[in-house]
Amino acid sequence: MGEKKPEPLDFVKDFQEYLTQQTHHVNMISGSVSGDKEAEALQGAGTDGDQNGLDHPSVEVSLDENSGMLVDGFERTFDGKLKCRYCNYASKGTARLIEHIRIHTGEKPHRCHLCPFASAYERHLEAHMRSHTGEKPYKCELCSFRCSDRSNLSHHRRRKHKMVPIKGTRSSLSSKKMWGVLQKKTSNLNYSRRALINLSPPSMVVQKPDYLNDFTHEIPNIQTDSYESMAKTTPTGGLPRDPQELMVDNPLNQLSTLAGQLSSLPPENQNPASPDVVPCAEEKPFMMQQPSAQAVVSAVSASLPQSSSPASPEPRPPHGQRNYSPVAGPSSEPSAHTSTPSMGNSQPSTPAPTLPVQDPQLLHHCQHCDMYFADNILYTIHMGCHGYENPFQCNICGCKCKNKYDFACHFARGQHNQH
């Protein structure tokens, strides 16, 4: 019977060692500094229990599933977080929990030595001290606004620029690069009806925007090789800094782009200097196409009948130079950017690869403006602008134009005053 007496001592000792190991493990996870002190205290208590026999210290252990065990005077949950005694808030570190408890107790230990300001959070005091020093480390990337608090900067972005930061893990852009993209898109709103096409002869160049490099993996329909081939012909790549040179990204803006080009052409009654020189006014039909319809449009434009005289096809231009390029009509000279047959008695050049013959009706033609459209939607929008009785009368405001150039300039200005 006397040999069974040490069993309670062994049980208490083993249980205390278990509590010591668990406490030390939890303190390492939470980053608490006082874990070593409690481990030493529990080990000392275990030694005293061995010396005093059955008079071991009482260990308070809570078996409630919602509360966990008591550590550092705070209840700890089973996932290792410290729990607030006033509410259900839980934190991994004691510093955060102490700051939270000050909300309940009303304690404000962080005081300003220049004014009566006091706060329960040290970071709030640091932001307050910037009001005395005048320091404004936070700057808006879209304008010259600066402030001393990050929350004021976020409020400024939402109120002034109507921008909300993108949340989630879908975007792989950094914050500075994302705000740079938003800045470019904001400038597009003010100049959306301006043209990007450069009218300097002999080629028309469309530069590639910088932000397309970041979103190419999300928009597979955009063919970046065409932009890159055109960007090589320009002195500088990327989006131009001039806000007047912006990308045309929808059918309405493409119509405005065409009208802006026609408005800059010389008058219709201008005579050419020589029979071999054709004025740029005869380069009137323009191809309005989208990147997804490039293959169909190029095949159709190459198969259109131009003249009854024998002609030889010119070499096919690079794929990237066909965007927004003039397409020769039934009575116009072939352009440098198309693969249409050449007029006159010219020597045969290197033949282009044979293209599949497509139905010419796929290319929509406006007989009033002598323009060709590869997109049915764009063609419908354009034809809806013509009047029923007078084709050069605006169908929106009723303004009567002289000719197709005046009609195109009227829609480029966008001033539809009801008469």
Curated annotation (Swiss-Prot):
Keyword Coiled coil: no
One term of GO molecular function: RNA polymerase II cis-regulatory region sequence-specific DNA binding
Gene3D superfamilies recorded: Classic Zinc Finger
SUPFAM superfamilies associated with the record: beta-beta-alpha zinc fingers
Gene Ontology annotations for the cellular component aspect, listed alphabetically: nucleus
Zinc finger boundaries on the chain: C2H2-type: 82-104, 110-132, 138-161, 364-386, 392-416
Record GO biological process: regulation of transcription by RNA polymerase II
Domain of life of the source: Eukaryota
Compositionally biased intervals (Polar residues): 223-236, 332-349
Compartment(s) where it occurs, according to its Swiss-Prot or TrEMBL record: Nucleus
UniProt KW keywords: DNA-binding, Isopeptide bond, Metal-binding, Nucleus, Repeat, Repressor, Transcription, Transcription regulation, Ubl conjugation, Zinc, Zinc-finger
Region: Disordered, residue numbers: 223-245, 288-356
Biased composition (Low complexity): 289-311
Cross-link position per record: Glycyl lysine isopeptide (Lys-Gly) (interchain with G-Cter in SUMO2): K5, K185
Similarity remark: Belongs to the Ikaros C2H2-type zinc-finger protein family.
Assembly description: Self-associates. Interacts with other family members; IKZF1, IKZF2, IKZF3 and IKZF4.
Annotated domain remarks: The N-terminal zinc fingers are involved in sequence-specific DNA binding and heterotypic associations with other family members.
Cross-referenced PANTHER family: ZINC FINGER PROTEIN, ZINC FINGER PROTEIN PEGASUS
Extra remark beyond the main annotation: 'Pegasus' was the winged horse in Greek mythology.
Free-text function comment from the UniProt entry: Transcriptional repressor that binds the core 5'GNNTGTNG-3' DNA consensus sequence. Involved in megakaryocyte differentiation.
Protein name: Zinc finger protein Pegasus
Organism: Bos taurus (Bovine)
Name of the encoding gene: IKZF5
